[in-house]
Swiss-Prot record:
SUPFAM superfamilies: Acyl-CoA N-acyltransferases (Nat). Probable toxin component of a type II toxin-antitoxin (TA) system. Might acetylate tRNA and inhibit translation. Should be neutralized by cognate antitoxin TacA (y4aR). GO terms for molecular function: acyltransferase activity. PANTHER family: ACETYLTRANSFERASE (PTHR36449:SF1), ACETYLTRANSFERASE-RELATED (PTHR36449). Forms a complex with cognate antitoxin TacA. Keywords: Acyltransferase, Plasmid, Toxin-antitoxin system, Transferase. This is Probable toxin TacT. Belongs to the acetyltransferase family. It comes from Sinorhizobium fredii (strain NBRC 101917 / NGR234).
Length: 181
């Protein structure tokens, strides 16, 4: 998980009093609405945590991601991953519930930096509590080409589609650890 070349930026928890959510615009209605209207509420309710990458001014948001705990039935994973799991119930997972980058920063490698930071943060959490996989749902915005590009991007990071739900992707925590070296 090498740095994608963008200048190193600080990624920190969302502070609604300091981080300018109103100016954020990624161009995808679901992502923009989530960040502007929902992210802080869900964070305050302890449903998820939001992390933002900012400009040097500490207020201009370049991008963000939101994570929370989740679980997945062992039966939903491909056989080679589920064979070491219990024969019943669910296994612990981390869920990337949303990730977005402001359009003004397109092409700077910031999206990759956000995803890398997210996966590193989850790996750190997995050192303290049990997490077997990371899950995410590929955003469907009505444009098949954009959806395909998102699938390809996540695949480059090692995510694989679940057999029963191809737009839900997973990445074993062991893979993240091996990539981090």
């Amino acid at each position: 998980m090498a740095n994608t070349g963008a200048a190193k930026r600080i990624i920190e928890p969302l502070d609604p009093n300091r981080h300018d959510r109103a100016a954020f615009f990624c161009g995808i209605i679901q992502v923009d609405n989530f960040f502007k209207k929902t992210a802080n509420k869900l964070s305050k309710a302890d449903n998820l945590r939001v992390y933002v990458m900012t400009e040097d001014d500490g207020t201009t948001v370049i991008g963000f991601y939101a994570i929370n705990s989740h679980s997945i039935s062992y039966a939903d994973l491909p056989e080679r991953f589920s064979r070491t799991r219990p024969g019943h119930g669910s296994i612990p997972a981390a869920y990337i519930s949303m990730i977005g980058r402001d359009q003004r920063y397109r092409g700077g490698g910031y999206g990759g930096d956000l995803l890398t930071d997210c996966l590193q943060r989850i790996a750190g959490i997995a050192d303290q509590i049990g997490i077997a996989v990371v899950l995410l749902d590929v955003l469907v915005c009505g444009d098949e080409e954009k959806t395909s590009r998102r699938v390809a991007l996540y695949s480059e990071y090692g995510f694989q589609p679940l057999p029963s739900m191809p737009l839900r992707m997973f990445l074993p925590i062991a893979t993240i650890r091996s990539l981090m070296g």
